[in-house]
Amino acid sequence: MPDRELISGDRQAEDAQFEVGLRPRRLADFTGQSKLKENLSIAIEAARMRGEAMDHVLLYGPPGLGKTTLASIIAEELQVQFTPTSGPVLQKKLDLTGILSNIRLHQVFFIDEIHRLLPDVEEMLYSALEDFRVDILVGVGPGARTHSLPMPKFTAIGATTRQGLVSAPLRGRFGLVLRLDPYNTEELKAIVKRSARLLTVEIEDGAAEEIARRCRGTPRIANRLLRRVRDYAQVRADGRINQKVAQTALNLLDVDRYGLDEIDQKIMMTILEKYRGGPVGVNTIAASISEESETIEEVYEPYLIQLGFLNRTPRGRVATELAYDYFKVKRKLREGDHPSLFEA
């Protein structure tokens, strides 16, 4: 199995210094997510035409698909200040008050991992999002009073990998709720070629496609693999990345040809072997592999479905013939099934 961090969509420490230089700054330069981009483009243009703050936006989807990049692009397109923070950083009401009290007119305020806000901090955010005011408690005990401070109108952008953990009251305060889906191979190939150009690395089409196929539909992983392949090309080849160099480097890193990790394989093998291909409920799968059902639904399933290994049905999850072939599992007959002429 490959290093889990290598094919994880979560941001790693080493990613930060590279991502800043590789991120597109305009919506037109952002590859993929065409429907989402159209919705954002309309909202941005409408806000500019009216001279107003854009509606609050909630972006959700698996990690590494570009939620933070899109938030910074929105600020760039609106030509306003961009203030980022994250749910875990806002530990106290005072932390949020300090940011909100300094927000300027039409500014973009970005909260990553918004599902991790503490309840009392989240409640304080409600009035800011809906009424553009901050309620501050002054004093203690019976003499304590609440003061409401007006705020300039601004745009809040929340990002989450776990939309199901965002409370309904918070979710309802966002005018736009948009999902990012895993990218297809052609989109990822274009991203790899663009990143290679910015890194001044020569790469052939076949090599870019090889990386694109193995990055789990995730640009962050694609860029991470590109850096590893670049290292291999410089040390073991002539610095140029052709398909053979890419294949050799990725095989050396134990990156599966579809970029599957241990959890992906556990999910599929549980369905294929333990439950004879399904249908089986997501809660049952979650209990079998000691994983949260929301994580399976929001992080792992989208990619497995995109690959054609898994189908969602009203009765549960069902493995496809492609999954049986790829994982080399022989289909087991259920009670009452009859073998075909070729299985008899």
UniProtKB/Swiss-Prot annotation:
Q: Which CDD domains match?
A: AAA
Q: Which residue intervals make up region (Small ATPAse domain (RuvB-S))?
A: 184-254
> Binding of DNA: at which residues?
312, 317
**Compartment(s) where it occurs, according to its Swiss-Prot or TrEMBL record:** Cytoplasm
Per UniProt, which keywords does this protein have?
A: ATP-binding, Cytoplasm, DNA damage, DNA recombination, DNA repair, DNA-binding, Hydrolase, Nucleotide-binding
Give the enzyme's EC designation: 3.6.4.-
One GO location term (cellular component) = Holliday junction resolvase complex
Q: What is known of its domains?
A: Has 3 domains, the large (RuvB-L) and small ATPase (RuvB-S) domains and the C-terminal head (RuvB-H) domain. The head domain binds DNA, while the ATPase domains jointly bind ATP, ADP or are empty depending on the state of the subunit in the translocation cycle. During a single DNA translocation step the structure of each domain remains the same, but their relative positions change.
Q: Which NCBIfam families match?
A: PRK00080.1, ruvB
This chain belongs to the protein called Holliday junction branch migration complex subunit RuvB
**Source organism of this protein record:** Solibacter usitatus (strain Ellin6076)
